[in-house]
From Swiss-Prot:
NCBIfam families: purM
Pfam families assigned: AIRS, AIRS_C
GO biological process: 'de novo' IMP biosynthetic process; adenine biosynthetic process
Name used for this protein in its record: Phosphoribosylformylglycinamidine cyclo-ligase
Taxonomy, superkingdom: Bacteria
CDD domains: PurM (cd02196)
GO cellular component: cytosol
UniProt GO molecular function: ATP binding; phosphoribosylamine-glycine ligase activity; phosphoribosylformylglycinamidine cyclo-ligase activity
Catalytically driven reaction(s): 2-formamido-N(1)-(5-O-phospho-beta-D-ribosyl)acetamidine + ATP = 5-amino-1-(5-phospho-beta-D-ribosyl)imidazole + ADP + phosphate + H(+)
Amino acid sequence: MSKQPSLSYKDAGVDIDAGEALVERIKSVAKRTARPEVMGGLGGFGALCEIPAGYKQPVLVSGTDGVGTKLRLALNLNKHDSIGQDLVAMCVNDLVVCGAEPLFFLDYYATGKLNVDVAATVVTGIGAGCELAGCSLVGGETAEMPGMYEGEDYDLAGFCVGVVEKAEIIDGSKVATGDALIALPSSGPHSNGYSLIRKIIEVSGADIETVQLDGKPLTELLMAPTRIYVKPLLKLIKDTGAVKAMAHITGGGLLDNIPRVLPKGAQAVVDVASWNRPAVFDWLQEKGNVDETEMHRVLNCGVGMVICVAQEHVEVALNTLRDAGEQPWVIGQIAAAAEGAAQVELKNLKAH
């Protein structure tokens, strides 16, 4: 008879009971997000969802994303309540720019040692994000992987599927010289540029838990959840039919994201003096001595979404967005690009 002790999965660092406890904790979160098209609840091998009624030629649109190294900041600050909304926002905002209505969302949560309370807090934030976007949280994967992550550190990925009528796909092909560009404000850096942000914090030696900007703690400004623009934008599309293109301003800022939806030969001329940049960006620029162009190439600088409409539709677009609770403004317009010119020109860049 072997004297070797009998090993269990728990001995290897994987707690099946903790995983099952988490599933029970988050069932109510998923239930709150349920859409009528979703068939069944959590726990099956695959999540089933019907195409909503009323579509003639439905096209499915998919996206996946993470939250970058904002997660490291969340772990350092032990603040996990809003990172789930960030995850949803990064996915659904990418879907809505082509006119799609998000249908369902799945998440992947990987960790070295599962902390059920932390994971439940994260998933509750995912559920809140799904409610804001009008999509169902239909499932996910929680992977406890000892030896792959340090302690209770975790990583997140999100996956979303939406639907759009084929004839109503928004792809930027109708963008024309003279069209207006409308901006929607961000809540802060959203979920991009955090490797630079963390480097600035490190180099400056700033205690971000004591710094206040405009009467708010810097940590609150840096961890503000990414805004979810789905419902106001779907209302704008449905009520006006005026939207020619939209760009979700993520990593790469205005300079890299607007060109993704512009046709060849079009240039976006953006007036950076058309809005007051939130104080958090000025603090980051000052503490990191960051070049002005680099700021706009890495961070959103206060702009979370850019919408292109014809000039004659500017007022109705602005009013529709305001009625939906947004604070839009005209940020620039479309011009004909000169030979070899960049597809985005930033006017009134301040000297740094």
